[in-house]
């Protein structure tokens, strides 16, 4: 049994929970990251739109976590994380009208 006390517990090790955990830990916050699933698996955030790269770059700089730049663009993901990925052109919806 682990008797360690954590400052923060994050439920969900998806892209948002993992990013938050690394940002907090980088700044000295004792962080516990908990997830019910196992990887690899599809998860929300696995597909993002290009504008998201600006957010990753901003968080990398603001919170001094340069590793987040690995998520800031298709070429960075393929080079630093996995070559088993592609580019999602857009998220969109189709509307069907009678007639």
PLM region descriptions:
Residues 2-16, 32:
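Beta1/beta-strand and adjacent pyrophosphate-binding region of the FAD-binding site
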Residues 5, 28, 88-90:
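A structure-centric signal for secondary-structure junctions around beta-strands
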Residues 13, 23, 81-85:
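Short secondary-structure boundary/capping segments within folded domains
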Residues 16, 20, 39:
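Conserved Rossmann-like nucleotide-cofactor binding loop
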Residues 20-29, 55:
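A short, Lys/Arg-enriched amphipathic alpha-helix followed by its capping loop at the start of a domain
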């Amino acid at each position: 049994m682990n008797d360690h006390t954590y400052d923060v517990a994050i439920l969900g090790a998806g892209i948002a929970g993992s990013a938050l955990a690394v940002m907090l830990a980088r700044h000295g916050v004792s962080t516990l990251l908990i997830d019910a699933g196992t990887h690899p698996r599809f998860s929300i955030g696995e597909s993002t739109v290009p504008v998201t790269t600006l957010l990753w770059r901003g968080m990398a700089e603001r919170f001094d976590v340069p590793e987040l730049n690995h998520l800031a663009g298709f070429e960075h993901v393929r080079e630093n994380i996995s070559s088993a990925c592609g580019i999602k052109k857009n998220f969109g919806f189709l509307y069907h009208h009678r007639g």
